[in-house]
A protein has these predicted regions:
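Class I SAM-dependent methyltransferase SAM/SAH-binding core
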Residues: 90-92, 96-144
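A conserved beta-strand element that flanks and buttresses the S-adenosyl-L-methionine
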Residues: 156
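A short glycine-rich, Lys/Arg-flanked "PGG" loop and its adjoining helix->strand segment in the class I
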Residues: 168-183
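C-terminal helical/coil "lid" or tail adjacent to the Rossmann-like core of SAM-dependent
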Residues: 241-295
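Core SAM-dependent methyltransferase catalytic element
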Residues: 257-258, 299-310
């Protein structure tokens, strides 16, 4: 197996590590992407979360949030789709269509169908001052999309898998509507693999805190759990990219779901010192002074390419 190292230097403070696997191994480090982070919209079957994304004001506010890192991830997702330009593409949990935009730019005669259950998010995307070419929207549930089998050449879901109450049903449904040989790309934040009981307890605590806002279906995945999910559904997995973005700054502004991560930090610091130390080791450190908090660490995202067997 070959190994290649790339270094690409830029500006600002953040950096990204890309560990790719495709019949070989490639490591690249890109410095200077900054530390603005933002998650895309995803589904959650709890009442509160669904209500938020069905609210027009919240949907519009969500659509305004973006970052260099999120844009970078969207481009990498588009790369992994390996488009020729004439594909029929399903964008599952499309939200306002932000990730569909860079994908659409690579199409010539193809089109993207974006499906979401939150009508307010779809409306905001539809009203955008710069409409996405060859992009069509429709309402629907992720685990029961309103399309015939073998309808799409490509499919993707971004920043949403951790919100699905039935992720196995979702990836199986995508397999149904994909044509033989079609690609399904999953982009999602990932947490560290649990190596011992402390890691397991920390993972439980993290999910508990996030569920207060995002509902009972919320669950962070690990790289191996997403790989197992796709493999069990019947996909062949030719490529997995793990990308880690670092931050070193005052406050949690721009860090994805940073407020919730800080809640985790504050609670484990008070209740479980052992978990606090593990959080610092696996994710980030935090130091308070006066009314400010300095945070330093990194969060990871996974890009997974699943192919429907011929």
């Amino acid at each position: 197996m070959s190994e290649e190292h790339k270094h690409d230097h830029g500006h600002d403070h953040g950096h990204e590590h890309d560990r790719s696997h495709e019949h070989g191994h490639e490591n690249s480090h890109q410095h200077g992407l900054g530390h603005g982070h933002d998650h895309g919209h995803a589904h959650d079957h709890s009442h509160d979360h669904k209500t938020r994304f069905h609210d027009p004001q919240h949907a519009a506010e969500f659509d305004r949030r973006t970052s260099e890192i999120r844009d970078d991830l969207a481009e990498k997702l588009a790369d992994m789709l390996a488009l020729q330009g004439d594909e029929q593409i399903l964008d599952l949990a499309t939200g306002t269509g932000r990730v569909a935009r860079p994908v659409a730019k690579r199409l010539k005669t193809g089109r993207i169908i974006g499906v979401d259950q939150a009508l307010a998010m779809l409306d905001v995307g539809h009203q955008h001052e710069d409409p996405i070419r060859a992009y069509y929207q429709g309402a629907g549930e992720a685990d029961a999309v309103p399309f015939k089998s073998n309808s799409f050449d490509r499919a993707f879901v971004s920043f949403s898998l951790h919100h699905f109450g039935n992720p196995a049903g979702v990836v199986t449904e995508v397999l149904r509507v994909l044509k033989n040989g079609g690609r399904f790309v999953v982009l999602d934040p990932i947490i560290e693999e649990a190596k011992d009981s402390v890691d397991v307890a920390l993972e439980t605590k993290i999910n508990q805190v996030f569920r207060r806002t995002h509902g009972d279906d919320f669950r962070f995945h690990t790289a191996s759990s997403i790989q197992r999910l796709l493999t069990k559904a019947g996909y062949r997995i030719p490529r997995i990219n793990i990308l880690s973005y670092s931050f070193n700054q005052e406050g949690m502004d721009g860090i994805p779901t940073g407020r919730h991560w800080l809640e985790v930090a504050e609670e484990v610091e008070k209740e479980a010192p052992e978990l606090a130390e593990r959080l610092k080791k696996n994710y980030f450190t935090w130091h308070r002074h006066d009314d400010h908090v300095h945070v330093k660490g990194s969060f990871s995202y996974g890009l997974f390419c699943g192919v429907k067997p011929e």
